[in-house]
Amino acid sequence: MTTVASAERACRSAARGFTLIELMMVVAIVGILSAVAVPQYQIYTGRAQLAEGIHMTEARKSAIAEVLMTGAALSAINGGGGSIPPDVTGGAGRYVDSMVVDAGSIVVTMKSSGVSPCVTGATITLAPVPPGTPDLAVSWVCSTTAVCRPLTCA
């Protein structure tokens, strides 16, 4: 009879489920992981959104480089002049609000809504460094006001 009673007790204790402490531990672990993962994901999405702005400058970068190869001064290179594409304002892309060329530099302004918090209203500036001779390529210096700046921008 004692073996039957101990077997019944073992079955009852095995079928009880999780204790409150175990559930609280799981909730605490999920909370800690979320506290780390959410900010990292926002930085990741912010960098991806900035990449759109940098990618959209490629046509203007090529046109500015061609003009610089002819010996033109940086101050004479503006959006819509010569072979430079015109400036774009008011929704240039999904995350980009405007793109302006001024004195050879390309300034991209990100949107103020619908973007990651670390990108809201940020600007990306790509400034050309003219080559010493026409045979060399134009290099570009990137700077941004975004908190989650990409590795290519200082």
Which residues does each predicted region cover?
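Periplasmic/extracellular, small/polar-rich flexible segments of pilin-like filament-forming proteins
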Residues: 68-154
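A short, glycine- and basic residue-enriched loop/turn
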Residues: 15-21, 30, 47-48, 57
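Alpha-helical hydrophobic helix detector
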Residues: 24-40
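Short alpha-helical segments used as structural interaction elements across diverse proteins
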Residues: 6-9, 13, 39, 44, ...
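N-terminal leader/signal peptides at the extreme start of proteins
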Residues: 1-21
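Residue-level signature of catalytic and energy-coupling elements of molecular machines
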Residues: 31, 60, 126
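Contiguous, function-dense segments enriched for cysteine-driven chemistry
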Residues: 26, 45, 100
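Conserved hydrophobic/amphipathic alpha-helical signal-anchor segments
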Residues: 35, 43-85
